[in-house]
């Protein structure tokens, strides 16, 4: 099957095209779609709390339709049904003081402990619980259509499934029978289909062999107070992973100097790290117009291990905060030993801590980034933000991105999986050389 390629999308506001020459429709072969945004009517309506699901009303460290306090209250009835037995503050397992929280779900079919980080403790609590709920939903999603081939669904598919991320040795072809989930395109709101195994995240052992097909990972899996909020977070993660894959020192990746960070809302996070005797190197990855992506690398004077984090957002302050707090969270994750998927190499290096040798900083020499414009105009419309990000992804990949609601009988919060067929993604640090990673 030949994938349908999209022409470049016009920028549009609140679902209406602004380019008069293009109009308000897109043509893909025999398919015409109206620029209307995602269509959530295929799934039950879900909104946490009573906030307006179309408007950003909270802008302190993150952009949400409601505050972390209100989200925290709305989440309480769902903890027990999801199997979350505890929420623990692990901030001071490390010396940095950046709020980090764990949510424990012992019966998980993936990771039993999820971590959340933020610039405030309440936001970190919400982050941890929401990540755990994301996992619970992705573990239990059910298919909507059974045993059909891509050829059977060709009239309804808006993309080529061969463009999805495949497992090594994948046996996928257009004639193989798969189970499918309903999806919506994010710009035109058309119904399409996504392979169930491209959404499912479940590592439970089964008593039968299954041919390798699609990559099982959580890239693009996100929750929120409403579907649009979750979708925006998922799109930003997909765009972040593409930025990491496309980062080239001196071309798209540049050093962020200390004097530039001083003008950001995250200056205090850098001060906390340095007050603890550690250091953080920052880079800006300029891949997406109108979006800011940062990479952070945390080093310690007494620990031969580096830890990294990334963040992408339309507000550079939020992007930088996410990168720094993710780096701090990754170190606490290793210290606590809480994740089942931690590589043993981390602890081999931890075993050398008695040497008190400082981790080698990146050997890459980056040019200084131009000053970051830390004050950018606020955008209140959540649908507009989703449309802008989806347009950017579609223009880069040539294919309209998709969203699947992770739905099942006990689903309780808005959780979506966003897929961007044809977009190259990576989570490997572009600030480390292969030699350094092997050491």
Curated annotation (Swiss-Prot):
Name under which the protein is recorded: Uncharacterized protein MT1419
Residues passing through the membrane, by range: none
A Pfam family per the record: YcaO
Domain YcaO span(s) in chain numbering: 116-439
PANTHER family tied to this protein: RIBOSOMAL PROTEIN S12 METHYLTHIOTRANSFERASE ACCESSORY FACTOR YCAO
């Amino acid at each position: 099957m030949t994938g349908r390629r999209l022409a470049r999308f016009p920028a549009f506001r609140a679902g209406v095209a602004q380019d008069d020459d293009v109009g308000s429709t897109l043509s893909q072969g025999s398919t015409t779609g109206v620029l209307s945004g995602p269509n959530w009517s295929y799934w039950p309506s879900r909104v946490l709390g009573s906030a307006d699901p179309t408007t950003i009303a909270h802008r302190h460290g993150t952009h949400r339709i409601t505050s972390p306090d209100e989200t925290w209250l709305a989440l309480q009835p769902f903890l027990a049904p999801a199997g979350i037995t505890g929420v623990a503050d692990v901030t001071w397992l490390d010396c940095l003081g950046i709020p980090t929280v764990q949510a424990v779900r012992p019966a998980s079919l993936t990771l039993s402990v999820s971590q959340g980080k933020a610039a405030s403790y309440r936001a970190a609590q919400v982050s941890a619980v929401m990540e755990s709920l994301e996992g619970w939903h992705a573990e239990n999603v059910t298919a909507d259509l059974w045993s059909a081939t891509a050829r059977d669904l060709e009239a309804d598919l808006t993309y080529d499934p061969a463009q999805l991320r495949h497992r090594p040795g994948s046996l996928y072809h257009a004639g193989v029978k798969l189970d499918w989930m309903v999806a919506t395109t994010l710009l035109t709101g058309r119904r399409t289909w996504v392979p169930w195994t491209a959404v499912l995240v479940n590592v439970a052992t089964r008593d039968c062999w299954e041919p390798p097909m699609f990559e099982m990972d959580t890239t693009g899996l996100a929750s929120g107070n409403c579907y649009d909020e979750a979708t925006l977070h998922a799109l930003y993660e997909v765009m972040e992973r593409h930025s990491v894959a496309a980062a080239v020192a001196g071309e798209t990746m540049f050093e962020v100097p200390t004097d530039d960070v001083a003008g950001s809302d995250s200056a205090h996070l850098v001060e906390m790290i340095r007050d603890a005797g550690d250091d953080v190197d920052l880079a800006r990855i300029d891949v997406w117009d109108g979006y800011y992506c940062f990479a952070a690398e945390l080093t310690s004077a007494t620990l031969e291990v580096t830890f990294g984090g990334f963040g992408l957002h339309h507000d550079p302050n939020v992007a930088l905060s996410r990168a720094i707090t993710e780096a701090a969270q990754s170190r606490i994750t290793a210290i606590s030993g809480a994740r089942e998927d931690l590589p043993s190499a981390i602890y081999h290096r931890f075993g050398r801590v008695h040497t008190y040798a400082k981790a080698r900083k990146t050997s890459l020499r980056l040019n200084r980034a131009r000053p970051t414009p830390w004050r950018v105009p606020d955008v209140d419309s959540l649908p507009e933000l989703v449309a802008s990000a989806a347009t950017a992804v579609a223009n880069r990949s040539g294919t309209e991105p998709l969203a699947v609601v992770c739905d099942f009988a006990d689903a309780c919060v808005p959780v979506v999986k966003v897929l961007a067929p044809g977009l190259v993604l990576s989570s490997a640090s572009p600030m480390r050389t292969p030699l350094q990673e092997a050491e």
